[in-house]
Regions:
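Catalytic histidine neighborhood in serine/cysteine hydrolases
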Residues: 202-203, 207-225
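Short beta-strand/loop motif that positions the catalytic acidic residue
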Residues: 182, 188-190
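Acidic catalytic loop of the alpha/beta-hydrolase fold
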Residues: 192-197, 224-225
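Catalytic active-site module of serine/aspartate enzymes centered on a nucleophile-bearing elbow/loop
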Residues: 220-221, 226-243
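Conserved alpha/beta-hydrolase "acid-adjacent" motif
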Residues: 174, 195-201
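Serine-hydrolase catalytic machinery in alpha/beta-hydrolase-like enzymes
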Residues: 42-132
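N-terminal cap/lid segment of alpha/beta-hydrolase-fold proteins
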Residues: 1-40
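Primarily recognizes the serine-hydrolase "nucleophile elbow" in alpha/beta-hydrolase
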Residues: 117, 121-181
Length: 243
């Protein structure tokens, strides 16, 4: 991991951009996180729209988490931002736009091509490097979308002990079986009127999770209308399980 820039944000948070091989990422840590008192880490998931486009939303989440005593980090997803384009993913995005513009159902082939290439091993490699930093000590949580990444990480990554998942992205059928293997505590957010989300599929996915502790928090409104108090509840969830 190589840090390529550093700045101190107004809220007393240190923001550092890094590269891990060809993977760009950003790490936010509270200034009050010295090596003598390492803090828990939350991995910030996001849709494959590019870190620059997602930055305002990501940094807002990072600042809130820092105020609660957490470090946060995120990486650029394959085929997005400045990373090389993947033809299969680009074709899936075009097929998705055509289907939605025509009001047609989004078939399984499009969903699989769009979601399955998003590389969970890259998140694990980032986690390996982040946990070597003296100011980060774990435990580790995952927060956000794409929900399929959160599911897969919860299954294969034992260092993640709690997750806040956003039920607002397409889910390959294979993920429903994997959801049954998830056993960590879950806090799931669902926007009830999300125009791009299959509400029933989101409810079925929640039902499939194997966790003994799981809660579903549904709110009226579209995809970007998550109320502030929903974030407050998610923060309390992480404080219970990571502190």
């Amino acid at each position: 991991m190589h840090f390529i820039s550093e700045q101190r944000l107004d809220d007393g948070v240190l923001e550092r951009e890094f590269t891990l091989g060809e993977i760009p990422g950003i790490l936010w840590t509270p200034v009050s996180a010295p090596a003598s008192a390492p803090v828990p880490l939350i991995l910030l998931g996001h849709p494959p729209l590019g870190l620059r486009r997602m930055y305002p939303r990501l940094v807002a989440r990072a600042l809130d988490s820092a105020a609660d005593g957490f470090a946060t980090a995120t990486i650029e997803l394959p085929g997005s931002g400045d990373r090389p384009r993947w033809p299969v993913v680009e074709q899936a995005r075009s097929d998705l736009r055509r289907a939605m513009e025509a009001g047609d159902p989004v078939n399984d082939e499009i969903v699989d091509a769009l979601i399955l290439p998003l590389a969970v091993p890259e998140w694990q490699a980032a986690l390996d490097a982040l946990l070597l930093l003296p100011e980060i000590g774990g435990p580790v949580g995952y927060s956000g979308g794409v929900i399929s990444i959160g599911i897969r990480l919860a299954v294969v990554e034992p260092r993640i002990c709690a997750a806040v998942l956003f039920a607002g992205s397409f889910v390959p059928r294979a993920m429903f079986e994997q959801a049954r293997q998830v056993t960590i505590p879950l806090h799931v957010l669902l926007q009830w009127d999300d125009e791009g989300n299959d509400r029933q599929a989101a409810l079925d996915l929640f039902d499939a999770f194997g966790s003994e502790e799981k809660s579903l928090h549904a709110h009226l409104g579209g995809h970007t209308g998550v109320p502030q108090f929903a974030g407050d509840a998610a923060a309390r969830f992480f404080t219970r399980h990571l502190m």
